[in-house]
Amino acid sequence: MARVKRGVTAHAKHKKVLKAAKGFYGRRKNTIRIAKQAVEKSLQYAYRDRKNRKRNFRALWIQRINAATREHGLTYGRFIDGLNKAGIEIDRKVLADMAVHEPQAFAALVAKSKASLEYLKNTTPNAFESAVA
């Protein structure tokens, strides 16, 4: 059986790791043993933070919507409740974008939300009043 030399394969693997470690600080960028650990850890961080990015953006959208609805005298929770009761299904990303770039359209949505909340408040009897009567 012929002898197998793995110099080419090992060199290619090392180059791949060092390429991924480009831009790292200190020996993490040019020492293969340390670079391999640093690249592995960076991939773990990347995986974790791809999940966190979704949470962070949703929180940012909610903050923007809340700020915009409070300018119109409504809280975020009441606004979303009003939209749901009005049958308007717009996701938070679009709502936040509308709040920033199209204030008139957003104001119309707030008005619809308020109207649906008022309508339901006037038509639905209060639980306390019905219990007393």
From Swiss-Prot:
GO biological process, one term: ribosomal large subunit assembly
InterPro entries, A to Z: Ribosomal_bL20, RIBOSOMAL_L20_CS, Ribosomal_protein_bL20_C
Alphabetical UniProt keywords: Ribonucleoprotein, Ribosomal protein, RNA-binding, rRNA-binding
GO molecular function: rRNA binding; structural constituent of ribosome
Pfam family, any one: Ribosomal_L20
GO CC entries: ribonucleoprotein complex; ribosome
Function: Binds directly to 23S ribosomal RNA and is necessary for the in vitro assembly process of the 50S ribosomal subunit. It is not involved in the protein synthesizing functions of that subunit.
Family, as annotated: Belongs to the bacterial ribosomal protein bL20 family.
Name by which UniProt lists this protein: Large ribosomal subunit protein bL20
Provenance organism: Chelativorans sp. (strain BNC1)
Designated gene of the protein: rplT
